[in-house]
Every structure is written in C-alpha cells, then in structure tokens.
Swiss-Prot record:
GO terms for molecular function: dITP diphosphatase activity; ITP diphosphatase activity; metal ion binding; nucleotide binding; ribonucleoside triphosphate phosphatase activity; XTP diphosphatase activity. Transmembrane segments: none annotated. Mg(2+) binds at D69. Homodimer. GO terms for cellular component: cytosol. This is dITP/XTP pyrophosphatase.
Amino acid sequence: MEMLVATRNKGKLREIERLLADTDIVVKGLDAYGDLPDVVEDGATFAANARKKAATMARLTGCLTVADDSGLAVEALGGKPGIYSARYAGEEALDSDNNRKLLEDMASVPEGQRQAAFHCVMALCTPEGDCQLFDGRLDGVILTRGRGEGGFGYDPLFLVPEYGRTLAELPLDIKNRISHRGQALKRLVAYLHSPG
C-alpha cells in the first residue's frame, strides 16, 4: 500500500518511515510529487490543521494521504507553544531558536512545575474527502538545558521521567515506540489493517 505523507520535514518523514518499517505501507513525502502548494496551517487545533493538510493533498494528488500536526504543550505556559511549536520563535525559526525561546519563557518556572506533553493528531484522508483522526500523547518534563544529540525539535529539552532521559538521549527504537507520533501512527496502522 502506498501513502503520501504530507510533509516536507525530513526529520518527521524519516521518523514515520522507521515507524512503518515492519508494515506493507510505502510512504512518499511531498517532494516526490513536484510543485505542490503549501497548506496554510490556520486551524485552532492540531486536529483541524492535520485534517486540512491531509484532505487538501489527497485531493490534489489523488493519493491516500496522512498528515499530522503535533507540538509541545507546557502547562506553566498555558499550553504554549501548542500549534505554534514549529514557529514559536518566529516563522523562519530553527529548532535551536525555538528551544532558546522556550527556555527563556520558562526561566522562572520552578523544577516541580515544568510538566509538558507532546501531542500528535494524524489525519488519514482519501481523495474523495473521507478522513479519520488518530491521536497520541507523551507526558514529560521540560529541563533547564538540553541533553542529548538525537532527535529534532524540542527533544533535547523533553525529559521522559520513566526513562530518566530526554527524547534526544533515548535509543531510536524506544523513542519511536513511546512517542506521541508513534502512538498516533500505531492507531492509524491498526485502522488500515482492520477488517472492513
């Protein structure tokens, strides 16, 4: 089965490819389809943004399409950066810029109040417009400085208490198994392989 993953984010595409390695699903990114327009993520929720991206690209390409919107929600910041996670420090922000802004915004937050969660909503849409949503969540704590070299985004700052390591420090197989994206993708794959 072939599926378009509506992203140009190479880190995200690699993560999804690894998560689907043991399935019969072959993924392609947007770059495989030439000059497709960007979809403006103007929804108020992860679900709205994921659905809009998947439905638009499925219609334009005629392919079964999955899109996700995901991000970090920090309790002490009222759920920020939330849907703005990728551009928290500005539209052209790098991961390092976003991490720096998060640390600045949390500078006065004490150790026991740094709870956060990564959220992911995946939308699977057909070219005809039928869509299903799948979600995942990973709870953790934001550190005062980054640790680890792996992963991308906020991974170096996000401590997973059960492992005593950041997502950037965890072996890839563990990260993929427990991640918010991994959980959502597991639900999506189960749906694709369910009878009827």
